[in-house]
């Protein structure tokens, strides 16, 4: 019988019910990323207070019971009667799109919390939430439970001389796949906010263990400190340059610094909200920066009349930029609820005006350094032309039969043509590759053995990559281009799974491949298309029963349970036959995969720098401290 679709099929979701029904629409996901997003929905409100001159400290506490407390020194949320007839505090926490940031009369000149859904969404997705507010001499409290239902009335706690808001909430385990917060993730984000809020302290405390850890982040020259933090383990070519200005009522603050790397990195913010997908402000910065450089180069003869202008990629090779703009509420436009891309047209012209004036002045005042930078850019231009030819060969296979030759005898392709379901296993070694080819489901699983040495691409150009057989093969196999031309939508595979031995060499191959993906196919990571397979460490046998174990802790528990057992330690994938490899590592119903993503671009950038940069001692120490080749500690750009 077909499902009926009539008048009774139409549902109206009341209040916060819509948030619980479709949480991804409001916080992006219900995994660890969405979980941490709850904190920042509340913190953003506290930051908006600080941004407008109210308060010098924001405290975030991970409580022992799994809840989170956010406390600020702002004016305190309004606690009187709202025009709707309900207490204003209740309106803030139970009504979507209720807030003081929708008009210039709302109490905020600039604010990141534009949509007015932050507090109510956190309430909707919490097991319980309490809010205490010190406002106009009064201290009050209101409590909610079970997805935002108010408990009792507004409680008056007495008089107070302080001001501010304290929100404590516990995420609902019925909504989230995990409710355990990562202290280091919260600290990284708090540090980032402190860089942008010069003079404002961000404090993070963890009361969940005996250490009772606390970190305080306070910077007087935030953007310069931000660059120094990012480049702590890099070779810089100059001191940080910082400038600020205002145009069209929009405040612009920027800092930049060159390193000896080939990649560019831009970290942009609007009203302290990270815009990971860029937007009009980034476009304005990049356009004005490139124009100022070209104007300078032509003025002083570094570019001749017959020469073409330097392109943006030439100018920004090795450039790290921090761009922070403050946009008045009346002009603020984000594309989407997650606020990852700015859409305000006026921001582009404002940033262009400030950057054009300030950068042109700096170039003139620092002629020797400016000339050195332009000569570096001219070399980058020549390398770009060579790399473009290499990319054309990679993408189009200009040499006759080159694509077939590259893949010949290596790739065991999948039968299906549906890229969405296809999986590409990158397997360490020929022997394991052979077992994987025999054990796989050939309908949708393809195997590409890695035979030679994978290149460390942290210090390479695209021309270097084109000469490396293993990476060249991988690029052809994925079929989506490389570098600036890469388009994840063109990928021949929906999943790319790295499958290596659980030892030092296997870990190193993982890191080399992840570095390549991060530098030259980053959208694969951003879209969650890259995974690490976890093969078992042990085969445990007792009688006719066999179990596979993935960590030493799991082995100890199994030995206590079963008593005397026979244990086989797998030193490599090649020690498993085709059936065992399928059952333990490749079968979707049995295997364990770790998705490698980028939840924190700053942290990912620093981690890749440490692991793959030219400072071997830092790399050795990080691997010793962080990698034990178990389920818990596999390399992950998110972690």
What is the predicted function of each stretch?
Residues 21-40, 109:
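Conserved short strand/loop->alpha-helix "switch" segment adjacent to the catalytic nucleotide/phosphoryl-transfer site
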Residues 26-33, 78-84, 176, 276-277, ...:
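Flexible beta-alpha connector loops of hexameric P-loop NTPases
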Residues 79-98:
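Short conserved segment of the HATPase_c
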Residues 1-9, 16, 40, 48-50, ...:
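GHKL-family ATPase ATP-binding module
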């Amino acid at each position: 019988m077909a499902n009926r679709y009539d008048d009774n099929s139409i549902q109206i979701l009341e209040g916060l019910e819509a948030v619980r029904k479709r949480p991804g629409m409001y916080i992006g996901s219900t995994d660890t990323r969405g979980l941490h997003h709850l904190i920042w929905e509340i913190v953003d409100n506290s930051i908006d207070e600080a941004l407008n001159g109210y308060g010098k400290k924001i405290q975030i506490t991970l409580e022992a019971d799994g809840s989170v407390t956010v406390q600020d020194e702002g004016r305190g949320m309004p606690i009187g009667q709202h025009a709707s007839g309900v207490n204003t505090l209740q309106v803030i926490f139970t009504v979507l799109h209720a807030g003081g940031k929708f008009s210039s009369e709302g109490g905020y000149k600039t604010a990141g919390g534009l949509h007015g859904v932050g507090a109510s969404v956190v309430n909707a997705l919490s097991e319980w939430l309490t809010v205490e507010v010190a406002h106009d001499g009064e201290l009050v409290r209101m409590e909610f439970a079970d997805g935002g239902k108010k408990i009792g009335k507004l409680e008056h706690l007495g008089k107070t001389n302080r001001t501010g808001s304290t929100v404590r909430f516990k995420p609902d385990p019925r909504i989230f796949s995990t409710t355990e917060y990562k202290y280091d993730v919260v600290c990284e984000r708090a540090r980032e906010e402190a860089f942008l809020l010069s003079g404002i302290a961000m404090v993070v405390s963890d009361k969940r263990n005996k250490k009772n850890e606390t970190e305080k982040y306070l910077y007087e020259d935030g953007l310069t400190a931000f660059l120094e933090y990012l480049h702590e383990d890099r070779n810089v070519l100059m001191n940080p340059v910082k400038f600020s200005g205002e145009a069209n009522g929009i405040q612009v603050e920027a800092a930049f610094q060159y390193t000896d790397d080939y990649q560019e990195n831009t970290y942009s913010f609007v009203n302290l909200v990270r815009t990971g997908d860029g937007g009009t402000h980034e476009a304005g910065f990049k356009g004005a920066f490139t124009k100022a450089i070209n104007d300078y180069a032509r003025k002083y003869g570094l570019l001749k009349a017959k020469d073409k202008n330097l392109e943006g990629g030439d100018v920004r090779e090795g450039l790290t930029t921090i761009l922070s703009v403050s946009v008045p509420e009346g002009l603020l436009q984000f594309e989407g609820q997650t606020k990852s891309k700015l859409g305000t047209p006026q921001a582009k012209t404002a940033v262009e005006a400030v950057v054009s004036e300030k950068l042109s002045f700096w170039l003139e005042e620092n002629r020797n350094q400016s000339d050195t930078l332009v000569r570096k850019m001219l070399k980058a231009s020549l390398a770009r032309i060579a790399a473009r030819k290499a990319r054309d060969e990679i993408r189009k296979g200009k040499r006759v039969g080159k694509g077939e030759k590259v893949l010949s005898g290596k790739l065991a392709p999948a039968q299906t043509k549906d890229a969405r379901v296809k999986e590409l296993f990158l397997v360490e070694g020929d022997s394991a590759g052979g077992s994987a080819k025999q054990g796989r489901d050939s309908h949708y699983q393809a195997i590409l053995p890695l035979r030679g040495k994978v290149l460390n691409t942290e210090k390479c150009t695209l021309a270097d990559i084109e000469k490396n057989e293993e990476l060249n093969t991988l690029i052809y196999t994925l079929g989506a281009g490389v570098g600036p031309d890469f388009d994840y939508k063109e990928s021949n595979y929906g999943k790319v799974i790295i499958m290596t031995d659980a030892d030092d060499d296997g870990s190193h191959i993982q890191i080399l491949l992840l570095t390549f993906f991060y530098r030259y196919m980053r959208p694969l990571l951003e879209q969650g298309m890259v995974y690490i397979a976890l093969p078992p460490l042990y085969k445990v046998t007792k009688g006719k029963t066999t179990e596979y174990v993935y960590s030493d802790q799991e082995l100890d528990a199994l030995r206590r349970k079963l008593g005397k057992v026979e244990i086989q330690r797998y030193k490599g994938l090649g020690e498993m036959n085709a059936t065992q490899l399928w059952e333990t590592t490749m079968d979707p119903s049995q295997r364990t995969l770790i998705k490698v993503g980028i939840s924190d671009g700053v942290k990912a950038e620093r981690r890749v720098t440490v692991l793959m940069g030219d400072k071997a001692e830092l790399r050795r120490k990080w691997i010793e401290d962080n990698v034990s080749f178990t389920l818990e500690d596999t390399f992950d750009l998110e972690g």
